[in-house]
Amino acid sequence: MGSKAAFVFLTMLAAGVSGIGASEASDQPSAKKEKAKKYYEMVVVPAGKFIYGTPGSSKEISLPAFSIDKYEVTNKQFSKFNLDHKYDKGGDNYPVAMVSLAEAKDHCAALDKRLPTEQEWEKAARGTDGRAYPWGDEFDKVLCITNENADEGRTSIIAPVGSCEKGNSPYGAADMAGNVWEWTSSFDERYSVLKGGSFFEGRNSAKTFSSLLSIPDDVKDYVGFRCVKDVK
């Protein structure tokens, strides 16, 4: 799923190709750099209180400020630090999957980041008002990638990051409902807590307060991650 652009116009330019052609050639790598830079963008979640937990047992807690990746970590990003990671052609900007908790932690650490706690992830997804989904309380399959997308010509498969940006969280984080479950640094006894739901499950798993427990060294094609960074 990945490809690298190769530029073969050097000899033509040396022979006196017009200025227009030279401009077009030089613009291509610039545009690709800007697109790649986009996927490293982070959004700030300010310090303060928010409603945490499932309805009926939710509570108000306070967290310090932090930044979180706007998008799930992509195949291309992950492969820069894990040379053994292979993926299909065309998948550069799909969320990485089939990664363990340790691999996710190592990737974040290489960027001077870390995995979010369950509470940090949930605040980044729902804001302060306790909403059920990043965009509000009513489910809308157009705003996320879940198995409800299997009809009307949309297949229930993993999608490129940022495919449903109209469903972004109050802080601008994308794909917080569906696409792939995401590792957190939180544990429930010996199990790691995953958040966000995936293309494989339905609307209930995609709720901001839903979670899934997993063995830390388990890998699945519907589990990925994103990183956070402390705001100093």
Which stretches of residues belong to each language-model region?
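Bacterial N-terminal signal peptides that target proteins for export
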Residues: 1-7
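Bacterial N-terminal signal peptides
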Residues: 9-16
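Signal peptide processing junction and immediate N-terminal pro/mature segment
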Residues: 20-27
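Short, P/G- and charge-enriched loop/turn segments at secondary-structure junctions
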Residues: 29-32, 55-58, 210-216
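A short glycine-rich, aromatic-capped structural motif
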Residues: 36-87, 98-102, 178
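Functional-site microenvironments in short loops/helix caps that host divalent-cation chemistry
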Residues: 51, 87-221
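Small-molecule pocket liners
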Residues: 66, 131, 225
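Short, structured beta-strand segments at or near domain termini in extracellular proteins/domains
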Residues: 221-232
